C-alpha cells in the first residue's frame, strides 16, 4: 500500500459514483427503448399473422411478446434500483455535509462563548429565539396560503381532466344516441299533445261531477 496516496475527497467520490450510475442508467434506458421498439414490431406481426388465420404462428409470436415484455419489466426494475441508489448516495453526502457544518458551527459558538458575557449571550439567544418564532409563524402562514391555493387549482384541474376523460370514453355512445333520438321540436310537440289531452280529459270528468 502506498502511504503517499492521497485520500479521496468524499465529494470527488460522490461525483465519480454519480457519473458511473448515470452511465449505467442511460445504458439501461437505451436497452429498454430498443426492446419497446421490438415490442411494437412484434405486435404488428401478431396482428398480421392473426388476420391470415395462422393460429400456430400467432401463438408462438404471442409467447415471444410475453417474454419480451418481461425483459422490459426487469430492466425497468433495474433502472428504478439504480435511481434509488443514486438518491440514497446523495442523501448520505447531504447528511455528511450537515454534520460537518454542525461541527464547524459548534467550534464557532465555542469561540464566541469565550469572548461574550454570559448575561449578554443569554439576551442575544432570547432575542434570536423570539425572532425565529416570528419568522416560523410567518413562514407557516404563507405556506398554508400557498398550499390552499395550489389545492384548489389541483382539484379544479383534476376535475377537468376527469370530465374530459369521461367525455372521451362515452363520446361515441352519446353521438350514436343523439343521431337516433327524435329532434327536440318533435319531442316537444308530442309532449305538448299528451299534456293537452290529459287536461281535457280531467275537465270532462269535473264537468260530469257537477
Curated annotation (Swiss-Prot):
Annotated coiled-coil segments of the chain: 28-84
Gene3D superfamilies to which the protein is assigned, alphabetical: 6.10.140.1230
Signal peptide extent: none
Pfam families, alphabetized: Snf7
Region (Disordered): 1-23, 178-200
Start-end of Basic and acidic residues biased regions: 9-23
Family matches, as InterPro entries: Snf7_fam
GO terms for cellular component: ESCRT III complex
Keyword annotations: Coiled coil, Endosome, Protein transport, Transport
Disulfide bonds: none
Any one GO BP annotation for this protein: protein transport
Main function: Component of the ESCRT-III complex, which is required for multivesicular bodies (MVBs) formation and sorting of endosomal cargo proteins into MVBs. The ESCRT-III complex is probably involved in the concentration of MVB cargo.
Similarity comment: Belongs to the SNF7 family.
Name of the protein this chain belongs to: Vacuolar protein sorting-associated protein 2 homolog 3
Source species taxonomy: Eukaryota, Viridiplantae, Streptophyta, Embryophyta, Tracheophyta
